[in-house]
């Protein structure tokens, strides 16, 4: 199958293929040298080479601005999901069982935010990542409450990226996206994990492929896509 479309398309599967051009950029390689390496080594298509290299250059530009000596990054976890995926090992709980405890969790989270802000007041906050779980399981007013608290508690003048993981398409609504836009969130991540409906059903992802496409459309912003080859039926 060498040289076939299937071989070319499958040659860059796996986690973070942009690490390849990123490493080459760090070594001082030019775009032409990166192109030739990825073409000869991975049989990658021109489209994938260009995309991976473009993203690597953007990442590299951000990384150069990070204050590694006096900076820090903040992770905030929202441990709730619409359902629990079959493969998941993260600390996460079905929202249906914990819905009446979410506001209490946010109360505790706000106290921890106050503590963290006081502890690191003398350092530069470089990036914020709200992950999970699925942060967009929060209601719009809860998302607004959380982000407002973050914005009021930390100095974000040196913050290069503010990410909210919108990992489940079935948790995304226009109202929630409007909250994120209002607060100037610079990056969201919509993760279908797979575009095969049979795999979604097998792993307990209670959304459709069509919902993923619709979520991308209403977001109308560049998003990250994690494709998890979660089942042997996707190997063919």
List each language-model region with its residue ranges:
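Conserved small/polar residues in nucleotide/adenosyl-binding loops
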Residues: 1-10, 226-233
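Conserved catalytic motifs of the protein kinase core domain
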Residues: 3, 71, 159
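Glycine-rich beta-alpha loop elements in corrinoid/cobalamin-binding modules
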Residues: 4-5, 9-40
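Short aromatic/hydrophobic contact patches that present stacked aromatics
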Residues: 22, 73-75, 163
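N-terminal [4Fe-4S]-dependent radical SAM core
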Residues: 26-74
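Local cysteine-cluster metal-coordination motifs and their immediate loop/turn environment
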Residues: 77-92
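Conserved non-cysteine loop/helix-boundary elements of the Radical SAM core domain that shape
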Residues: 92-232
């Amino acid at each position: 199958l060498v040289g076939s479309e299937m071989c070319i398309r499958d040659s860059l599967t796996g986690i973070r293929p942009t690490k390849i051009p990123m490493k080459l950029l760090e070594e001082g390689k030019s775009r032409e040298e990166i192109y030739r390496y990825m073409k000869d080594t991975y049989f990658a298509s021109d489209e994938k080479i260009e995309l991976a290299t473009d993203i690597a250059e953007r990442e590299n530009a951000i990384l150069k601005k990070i204050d590694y000596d006096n900076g820090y990054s903040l992770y905030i976890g929202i441990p709730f999901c619409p359902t629990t995926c079959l493969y998941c090992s993260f600390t996460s709980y079905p929202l249906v069982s914990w819905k009446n405890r979410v506001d209490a969790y946010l109360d505790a989270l706000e106290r921890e935010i106050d503590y963290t802000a006081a502890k690191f007041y003398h350092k530069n906050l470089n990036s914020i990542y709200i992950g999970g779980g699925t942060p967009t399981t929060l209601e719009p007013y809860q998302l607004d409450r959380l982000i407002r608290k973050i914005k009021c508690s930390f100095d974000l003048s040196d913050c290069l990226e503010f990410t909210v993981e919108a990992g489940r398409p079935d948790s995304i609504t226009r109202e929630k996206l409007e909250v994120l836009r209002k607060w100037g969130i610079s990056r969201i991540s919509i993760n279908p994990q797979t575009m095969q409906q049979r795999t979604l059903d097998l792993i307990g992802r209670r959304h459709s492929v069509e919902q993923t496409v619709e979520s991308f459309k209403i977001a109308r912003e560049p998003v990250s896509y994690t494709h998890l080859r979660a089942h042997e039926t996707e190997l063919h």
